[in-house]
Amino acid sequence: MTNKTFFLAVLKEEAPRFKKAIEALPDDKHGYKVQERSRTAGNLAAQLAVQWKAISPIAISGSPKFDPHELDNLTKADMLAELDKGMTQLQADVESISDEEWETGQAGWGEAKNDTKYHMSWAFLFDAIHHRGQLITFIRAMGAKVPSIYGPSADDDK
């Protein structure tokens, strides 16, 4: 299995987990923060929804495109639609480049000016997984049920 094939397989496995995390966010708790300096739950969920639109351009042009204003005022339905659309586009964009381009194509953004497409794409995926974990801790603190992500949740069948 190539690195690119593995990335696509992991992306396919993780997509429903991101969806579960967004679905678990109560509609009336988007503004919830665990601490004043923390991001809101809605902002974290919105990032999970649109992160894929940032990774797609890495595969194609070597540079992510991220608009933080996209994270504002999204409903849960908007987030779920963006997630589905972004995941579909990302898969198509990664599939469209050769394994060689994935492995050796140059990518750059911010301090990571001399990176590769595969490394930067994986970093953005891991960043999304990290933020999903943050959101999940918010969900329980809000009094909502935590979905199973990698295994059973203490909230299953309750």
Annotate each language-model stretch with its function.
Residues 1, 35, 73:
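Exposed loop/turn and edge beta-strand positions of beta-sandwich/beta-sheet ligand-binding modules
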Residues 3, 7-10, 79:
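Residue-level preference for long, well-ordered alpha-helices that form the structural scaffold
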Residues 8-12, 16-22, 27-69, 108-158:
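Short, contiguous alpha-helical
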Residues 74-108, 115-138:
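Acidic/histidine-rich alpha-helical segments that form the ligand environment
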